């Protein structure tokens, strides 16, 4: 919803998403082009009950659609997040691993693909976070993709297109870390 889960109203978010899944599947599920689900809550830090949303909504989507693939695209709580720029502390690689290990343990069987957004950390840190993402995905039998942000967070004006050299750095870090696929926005 972009609203309820951010306000901590997790059951309302779950109910709304389940109704939407039912409606979308009824209307579009018969199309050959319908190949999976995107669970749209883009989170970073462990939030109380957030993994419950991923788990319940993901399992429901899979149950109504004959086990179609589910994808999440969270973000790394790094130095370029709005929260950190407003005074919150960025997660270290170790903290990121600990928090996401717990989240992914809670969503086993509900999420098939994890595609972390890559724009909230410094370029020199990206590879280390991607390695952890891949390690965790492997642990929980998920596919690990990268979601490459094709805009530049380092500019005072948000969001200008990224320079090719920076995009290439991100692609190379993803390749070296073993990402299985790349998407972008």
Task: Indicate residue ranges for each PLM-predicted region.
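Glycan-processing catalytic domains of CAZymes
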Residues: 1-185
